[in-house]
Amino acid sequence: MTRVMASRTVPWIPVEHRLDVILSPDLPPADGTTSAFVFVSDSTGRTLLTCVDRPGRGWDVPGGHLEAGESASEAAVRELQEETGLLLEPSALSVFAWQRIELLRPAPAGYRYAPLTYMVMFRARLAAPGAATAPPAGSESTGAEWLPRARIKELCAHRTWLPLLERL
């Protein structure tokens, strides 16, 4: 079942738009999917986050843009390893949500995204407590930590994906 959990706007999209957070076990249309993220939870209920030391980033769910020819699950696994050092197989992931971004006015010159795009949200669950992990050398991330939900809510109150945290 597909269900809209929240709708909002964000300051990093330079035109009138709507961002919907959608709970769904199915992938969104592949031709509009631009990025993939993965919520990894361990047996203690903690979730692995990464810290990106760039303006506007900070603590976030590991993920990023798809590369040419890459599936959403392949991108999620690659980004997870690049940003946290944790390596999972694509088969360990399941789709549970996505974010749909729809531009409501024409995009400004130079805007690189289509008027309708999607960000896929995967989840994975570890059967044991998550081991300490760190981003590999050269990563854009400066740290990775297994955090309890209360701490995630403090650090990530502004994140569009926050309504999904309770669905892990």
Identify the role of each PLM range.
Residues 1-39:
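Acidic, metal-coordinating catalytic segment for phosphate/diphosphate chemistry
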Residues 2, 72, 153-157:
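A binding-site-centric feature that preferentially detects glycan-recognition modules on secreted/surface proteins
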Residues 21-27, 99-105, 112-116, 149-152, ...:
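Class I (Rossmann-like) S-adenosyl-L-methionine-dependent methyltransferase catalytic domain
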Residues 28-29, 38-40, 46, 66-68, ...:
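Hydrophobic alpha-helical segments that drive targeting, anchoring, or assembly
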Residues 42-83:
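Conserved Nudix-box catalytic region and its N-terminal flanking loop in Nudix hydrolases
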Residues 46-47, 128-133:
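Short helix-loop capping/hinge motifs at secondary-structure junctions, enriched
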Residues 86-130:
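Active-site segment of metal-dependent pyrophosphate-handling enzymes
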Residues 120-123, 132-166:
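NUDIX/MutT-family hydrolases
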